[in-house]
């Protein structure tokens, strides 16, 4: 049998004749600047910030990101292929799924890109808050899609990537240039002062081979 009682701000549990005491969080005085473990926040090691040239290089070198949408009750995060033209990021979205509705409901998002070595001796990541807009101009859409075709070929990506872009893996990559099975999104309204780029201590991301 378990009998629980409250005495002088402590919780006592009587089990098999033994008394266990758990100090209530309300009975432990907290000092300003200290967390619940008693470690002063001033002692916490902070990861180094990335310079603009560093996170620009990270964005240029990678091609997979995560986009966080506002969602309903919870935020919704989805992975995307992207291309970067040195100024803007573009994404190819299949025309189905919750991400499409979340984009229509609220185009304000945060894009996250990361790089890390298998043993985490090197790692870095950057988050970019901004606004997604859908590209409607036919010429611009084709230009961006052609760059995605080039990305998939140059990175030697599996045909399975086509299934994430609204196409069958059995289709040639050039099928991205035909039909309306996907949409082109562009990240805009990114303010440099809102970009957060962090890296591991002494990390220097290596360019992919």
Can you annotate each of these PLM segments?
Residues 94-98, 149-152:
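Short, solvent-exposed aromatic-acidic interface loops
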Residues 98-106, 110-133:
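Helix-adjacent hinge/juxtasegments
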Residues 62-95, 111-112:
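Short beta-strand segments
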Residues 26-33, 38-39, 44, 122-209:
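Charged, gly/pro-rich active-site loop segments
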Residues 39-66:
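Short, basic/aromatic recognition patches
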Residues 13-15, 27:
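Short hydrophobic targeting helices and cationic amphipathic motifs
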């Amino acid at each position: 049998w378990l009998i629980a009682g409250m005495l002088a701000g402590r919780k006592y549990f009587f089990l098999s004749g033994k008394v266990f005491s758990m100090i209530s969080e309300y009975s432990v005085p907290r000092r300003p600047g200290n967390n619940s473990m008693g470690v002063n926040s001033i002692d916490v090691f902070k990861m180094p910030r990335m310079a603009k040239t560093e996170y620009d290089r990270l964005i240029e070198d990678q091609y997979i990101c995560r986009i966080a949408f506002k969602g309903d009750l919870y935020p919704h995060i989805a992975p995307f292929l992207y291309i970067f033209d040195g100024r803007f990021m573009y994404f190819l979205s299949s025309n189905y799924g919750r991400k499409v509705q979340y984009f229509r409901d609220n185009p304000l998002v945060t894009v996250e890109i990361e790089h890390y070595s298998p043993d985490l001796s090197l790692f870095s990541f950057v988050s970019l808050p901004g606004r997604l807009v859908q590209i409607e101009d036919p010429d611009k859409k084709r230009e961006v899609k052609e760059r995605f075709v080039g990305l998939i070929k140059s990175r030697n990506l599996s045909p399975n990537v086509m299934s994430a872009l609204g196409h069958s893996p059995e289709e040639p990559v050039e099928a991205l240039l035909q039909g309306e099975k996907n949409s082109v999104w562009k990240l805009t309204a990114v303010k440099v002062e809102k970009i957060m780029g962090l890296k591991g201590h002494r990390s220097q991301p290596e360019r992919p081979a």
